Amino acid sequence: FTRKQKLQLFREQFLGVTKYGKACKILNEDAIDFNYDLETFTFTASCSEPIKVENPLLGYIIDFDLQDFYVKFNFKTIKSINAIQSLFLGTVKYTETKIDEKIIKNRNDVYFGSAVDFFKGIIDNSWSEKKFILFEDKFSVNPNDYFKVLKKDDLYEVTVTSTNKVSLSIGGIKKTNFYA
């Protein structure tokens, strides 16, 4: 696979494919290293310095210290649509570049239904107020039966406790499936 193809996959998985993700620009792409393991069909990325991302629609410069990144496939491919598992871990620092009413609206739009909003709902048990609904098959289920929250110092650890396939909906729109 070419570096251009690898960079496209990285951008899709790291920044996302929404209008907000597509508007972002990685300012130090040359510092990112890629690898594709042909035996396990696993794409990995690493960077020896924080990845610097400009997000003009949300008014941030983001420094992301990438600790782990991979995308797994069932066969030799590099297309996001064929990914069966992906993960990225790291720490992040946000620096505001500007703020106005449009940026505040954009930030609110992005936050509602986001992974951060989802995990906050798990931690503070505010599923119904946030309009998150968890389904097993076609039946809504109690999220407390599927997640265990453990507080460690100032951090929270969230564990999926069921091995059943469950679906997540927010505001009546199916967002994702996940498994333990």
Please give the residue ranges for each predicted region.
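Surface-exposed, low-complexity/disordered segments
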Residues: 1-180
